[in-house]
Amino acid sequence: MSEQVCKADMGSDGAAVVDTYGYPVETTGNAVLDILEHRSSTRAFARDDDDRPVAVTDEQRAAILHAASRAPSAGAMMMYSIVSIREQATLDRLADLCDHQPMIAKAPWALIFVVDYAKWIDLFEHVGCFEPEFVERTGKSPRRAPGLGDFAIAAQDAMIAAQNAVVAAEALGLGSCYIG
């Protein structure tokens, strides 16, 4: 390449920082902003000599899931769940269910973020919010079940958690790809 790379665009090892296509990119000196700037979807994951996906370590998985759990959520309700998939047969089936996208089957690990009202309902039932005695005891109306607006909020919360997971994966040197 004939483009000049300034010192600010060098990695810690002195090598030029390049984008997905090999072109030099500018860096800000801020690790989070640089991760966000340089992140792109990965559809070809690292393979070992036997053409198996390179495993994501337990420590990497824990860090990514912890980052996802730190995402803000409406009312701190976290009305979503994260399904972790490492079994090849399940990855194969997921690839088929998601419009036959083979990169899912070739990934070492997949996370599914789903709206999950069960947590809300279980909590309300546990503390008696649906019982007539609740009104008597607290002077408040009985709590309602989740509605359509709550579904939208829960879906947004799930996507915020997913974005935290993506940024954490990128920070750990792992690629990711959202599947709709």
Tell me what each language-model feature is.
Residues 1-180:
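Acidic, surface-exposed loops and disordered segments
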